Amino acid sequence: IETFLANDSIPGTELVTRACERLTYEGHKAYCGINGDFFNVTDHKEFPLGAPRGGSIRDGEIQREPRDAWWGFATIDADNIPVFDHMEFEGTVNAGDAGVYKFQHVNIPRADCDACDLTFFNRYAGERTRQDENFSEMYGVERTEVYLKLAAGEKWKVNSPVQCIVGRRLENKGGNPIAADVCSREQVKSPGPFCVI
């Protein structure tokens, strides 16, 4: 059993038959797909289209953060035991002397709450970072993006720290490219100590 996103991207839709063709290769056969979550459709008027409304994790890499909601989650833990429960997510960046910063959003920024000024983007976000597509008041707001790469020997995992190397830093309105092996932290509002790691 594996998790997958349409076109391996938060924004996007894909027929299950096409996904099975794409995910089948020598030694690995994808033969069916189950809609494991609700997702954004045109009638919801929530964006990006195709984005799961709950959480999604693949091989220790968060595609969409689990959010406290009225529905529970189905998952398989590291010991291959099924878990059905409500789950929440909170990430932490420990920047040493520059401080510790918490974030709750992965790949889909939100601007409608006090804790929404920090978003983590990875390869599942699509080709570029983005602004909150559901809160037009945030369009055009300057932001700071800091690009991170896993340190040598590290791999993504949940419920455990990972060490990253800080790369470039950009200050603009977002929409910057995301490379497959690079992640971006985006901070809206005034740049704080996190942005000068």
Q: Which role fits each region the language model picked out?
A:
Residues 1-197:
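Gly/Ser/Thr/Pro-rich low-complexity, intrinsically disordered segments
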